[in-house]
């Protein structure tokens, strides 16, 4: 009888890709295992649609993709941001129950587990109805996971964690070697309007799961991983990363060819790449400051610049229709020999290109892992979610990044941010980022971590062995 795992990712590209690539890894490592991935559509994220199409166009043996029925975007648009994903899964519970019921009744298949994104952990109730064990996938790092458990524990002890918002307190968090400034705490955990009670309820449910699988590796976050393992109230931890989509999403291949062709013409390690994630957009005044900082730095650049969602629209836009309307007058002409401004970018391919020597990033966890895998140092520009914390970890804990602004917050459901990072700061930090290896300790550390990341995924590496232990638990 074959064994089957059911995966339920959250419908945002950073969550979905990690779980699907993990499913492919599971299948490649265990010949008697099949995986069914249940995908819910999310109205804002065009990347989900593109990636989904690529999966259906290039199927993987023993990997089944099931698209759950689409729901009306109007069901979510007026909800507070913390309530959107819970609403998504609530609308899909009946469909998920029917799928699990049908699979558990099969005489040829044994359902060995449900692996749910942390945001969808409440689906555990349905898995329990069918005696299917639930495992949790954490798309963020071990440091963040430890912080969330710590804040949830404080909340359970009746400490008002919202008091940390806008304070100069430093917290002693078990998953961090250094005190964590309150200013880098994810706002969703300390904002009275941010749904922190609901989020902490998810981490309480996580403690009921069979195990937690994290997209990280021992050598990157040894302190955080060890702290989680030392806590008897946290389920077994399995770091199995870095799990990355190294082949891209299969879309925009013509645009990718143009971008990579331009990089082919640049000297090695000469280009700084700017990309701020699926929801990383700026107001016009900030765009102009970035442009001036880039121009003054004198470095070659590739800049992924994407517009905010237009009023009345529900989907992110891939690029501006007219760049001259938002950039400084004459910028494109003056920098035409050294720079290229684009919309969508094939991020992993760009980071892996020998011409790229630095990455100005929003510090999403997937982007962090990609920069490590490719050995490209980062200048941190965190914007939303847990990215401020990721930036702090990269700069202070790991020493693999240059700090620009770790307190910049531009929450993707509230783009009205008055804080401006000035051109002078951007110029200075880009110059520091692009220093050669002889003069840059950060660049040396990133190159070392690149080798460690690849060893972790190789036979008998730390993540390879961690996955083997997880199979023993599941099978």
UniProtKB/Swiss-Prot annotation:
Gene Ontology MF terms: UDP-glucosyltransferase activity
Protein name: UDP-glycosyltransferase 101
Functional note: Component of the dammarane-type triterpene saponins (e.g. ginsenosides or panaxosides) biosynthetic pathway. Glycosyltransferase that catalyzes the biosynthesis of ginsenoside F1 from protopanaxatriol (PPT) and the conversion of ginsenoside F1 to ginsenoside Rg1. Triggers C20-OH glycosylation of ginsenoside Rg3 to produce ginsenoside Rd. Mediates the conversion of protopanaxadiol (PPD) to the ginsenoside compound K.
UniProt source species: Panax ginseng (Korean ginseng)
Keyword terms, alphabetized: Glycosyltransferase, Isoprene biosynthesis, Transferase
Family: Belongs to the UDP-glycosyltransferase family.
InterPro entries: UDP-glycosyltransf_plant, UDP_glucos_trans, UDP_glycos_trans_CS
Positions with a binding annotation for UDP-alpha-D-glucose: 345, 347, 362, 365-367, 370, 386-387
Residues the record marks as active site: 15 (proton acceptor), 117 (charge relay)
Top-level enzyme category: transferase
E.C. numbers: 2.4.1.363, 2.4.1.366
Family matches, as Gene3D superfamilies: Glycogen Phosphorylase B
Top-level taxon in the UniProt lineage: Eukaryota
Gene designation per UniProt: UGT101
Keyword Transferase: yes
PANTHER family named among the record's database cross-references: GLYCOSYLTRANSFERASE
Catalytic activity, reaction form: (20S)-protopanaxadiol + UDP-alpha-D-glucose = (20S)-ginsenoside C-K + UDP + H(+); (20S)-ginsenoside Rg3 + UDP-alpha-D-glucose = (20S)-ginsenoside Rd + UDP + H(+); (20S)-protopanaxatriol + UDP-alpha-D-glucose = (20S)-ginsenoside F1 + UDP + H(+); (20S)-ginsenoside F1 + UDP-alpha-D-glucose = (20S)-ginsenoside Rg1 + UDP + H(+)
One Gene Ontology term from the biological process aspect of the record: terpenoid biosynthetic process
Residues reported to bind an anthocyanidin: 15, 385
Pathway annotation from the record: Secondary metabolite biosynthesis; terpenoid biosynthesis
């Amino acid at each position: 009888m074959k064994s089957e795992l059911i995966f339920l990712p959250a419908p945002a590209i950073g969550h979905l890709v990690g779980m699907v690539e993990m499913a492919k890894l599971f299948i490649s490592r265990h010949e008697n295992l099949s995986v069914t991935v249940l995908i819910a559509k999310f109205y804002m994220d065009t990347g989900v649609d593109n990636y989904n199409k690529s999966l259906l166009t290039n199927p993987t043996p023993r990997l089944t993709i099931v698209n759950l029925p689409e729901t009306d975007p109007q069901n979510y648009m007026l909800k507070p941001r913390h309530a959107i994903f819970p609403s998504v899964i609530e609308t899909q519970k009946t469909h998920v129950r029917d799928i699990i019921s049908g699979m558990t009744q099969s005489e040829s298949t044994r359902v060995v587990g449900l692996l749910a994104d942390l945001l969808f952990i409440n689906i555990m109730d349905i898995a329990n109805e069918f005696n299917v064990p639930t495992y949790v996938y954490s798309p963020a790092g071990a440091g963040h996971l430890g912080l969330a458990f710590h804040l949830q524990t404080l909340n359970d002890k009746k400490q008002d964690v919202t008091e940390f918002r806008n304070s100069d307190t430093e917290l002693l968090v078990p998953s961090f070697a250094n005190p964590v400034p309150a200013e880098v705490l994810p706002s969703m955990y300390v904002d009275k309007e941010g749904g922190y009670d609901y989020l902490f309820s998810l981490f309480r449910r996580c403690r009921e799961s069979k195990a937690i699988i994290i997209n990280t590796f021992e050598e990157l976050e040894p302190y955080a991983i060890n702290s989680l393992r030392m806590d008897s109230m946290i389920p077994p931890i399995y770091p199995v990363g870095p799990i990355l989509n190294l082949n891209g999403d299969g879309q925009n291949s013509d645009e990718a060819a143009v971008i990579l062709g331009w990089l082919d013409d640049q000297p090695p390690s000469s280009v700084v790449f700017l990309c701020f994630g699926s929801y990383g957009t700026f107001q016009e005044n900030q765009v102009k400051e970035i442009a001036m900082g880039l121009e003054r730095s004198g470095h070659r650049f590739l800049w992924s610049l994407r517009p905010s969602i237009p009023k009345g629209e529900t989907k992110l836009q891939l690029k501006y229709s007219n760049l001259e309307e938002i950039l400084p007058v004459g910028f494109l002409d003056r920098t035409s020999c050294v720079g290229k401004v684009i919309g969508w970018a094939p991020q992993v391919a760009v980071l892996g290109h020998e011409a790229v020597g630095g990455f100005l990033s929003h510090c999403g966890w997937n982007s962090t892992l990609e920069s490590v895998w490719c050995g490209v140092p980062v200048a941190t520009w965190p914007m939303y979610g847990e990215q401020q914390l990721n930036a702090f970890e990269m700069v202070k804990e790991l020493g693999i990044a240059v700090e620009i602004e770790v307190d910049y917050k531009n929450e993707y459901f509230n783009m009205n941010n008055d804080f401006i990072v000035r051109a002078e700061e951007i110029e200075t930090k880009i110059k520091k980022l692009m220093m050669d290896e002889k003069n840059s300790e950060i660049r040396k550390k990133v190159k070392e971590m690149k080798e460690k990341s690849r060893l972790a995924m190789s036979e008998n590496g730390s993540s390879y062995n961690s996955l083997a232990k997880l199979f023993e638990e599941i099978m």
